Amino acid sequence: MTDAVKKIAKLVVDLHGEKNTQNIIEVAKAGGKESAEAVLFKKLTDAIIKDMTAMINHGDSKEKMQFTSTEQDLPMAEDTTLTNNKLFWFSVVVGIVLFVTAINYLLDKVCWIKAARKIAITCFLISVCWNYINIYEKTMAKRYMVIRQGIPGGCMERGADWSTVLRTMFKTLMITHSDSNDECLQYAKSIIVEPLFEVTPTTALATTISDLILVPINLAAKSCNNVFRTVFEGVPVFMIPILVFLLVYISTLCIISTKRYTISVPFLLELKPCLVEPPPMVPISVRNETCNVVHKKPVALRRGLCYNKLFRNKKY
């Protein structure tokens, strides 16, 4: 028996769990036509396949256990997220109720015009600070990007060759430069100038005022654009001028009719001031009677009025 056969038999014993190596060798010798090495090699491969299938089955069972555990944990995670969402919305509702209660109490104690004025001034000051921080952060981002790109290629450095010097001189003499187009100056400013001093409070104030005026106009213009787009959607191109004329005509008539003008349309339009009829004249007898009734006063009251007039007109 060779050493190879003994080693294979030992491996088979280790894999199959057999207790006696000699029994395996005898079984291998009694294999008939096949040699002992071939029989033992088959047994070895069978043992390896058996162990591999067992390992695979064990891994599948572990994955199934992990999957079932994750499936069991999922409802718990969903429950925690639901509870967190409920707490968040509950806190939001409580905050809104407290805010409305405080506003109602303040409006009962203070004049609502003064309260609205104070709230508007406070919001304006907060917006100024907000815009200042926003502009400062944007300036910092621009400065970071300029520094990150490095020194521009056209800028002269110490130890530059003659080609760089001549190119820079040619650009300086032949090409007009401005401060906004000068890359070297922009790079130097981004390194030296602090953004805190570049962004001034007046800039934030002007930005806030312009936003206060222009942002509502911008939103109104966008809304009008959407309205006209929906009105003219699906209308042929040659019908659009007619529709615009009709809209302008109808809106003009509505505006003018509120100003007490008469509108006649023999040739599409004619404007005249509205003729207002005067009220009917009251008969003279009725007017005299009403005047007598109105001006008839008690004697004591008339005397008092006379005395008051005398003392008022008398000069001492």
UniProtKB/Swiss-Prot annotation:
One Gene Ontology molecular-function label: chloride channel activity
Record carries keyword Transmembrane helix: yes
GO cellular component, one term: host cell membrane
Keyword Mitochondrion: no
Topology term for the membrane: Multi-pass membrane protein
Localization terms from the record: Host membrane
Keywords of the record: Host membrane, Membrane, Transmembrane, Transmembrane helix
Chain ranges passing through the membrane: 87-107, 116-135, 236-256
PANTHER family, per database record: CHLORIDE CHANNEL CLIC-LIKE PROTEIN 1
Name of the protein in question: Putative transmembrane protein ORF57
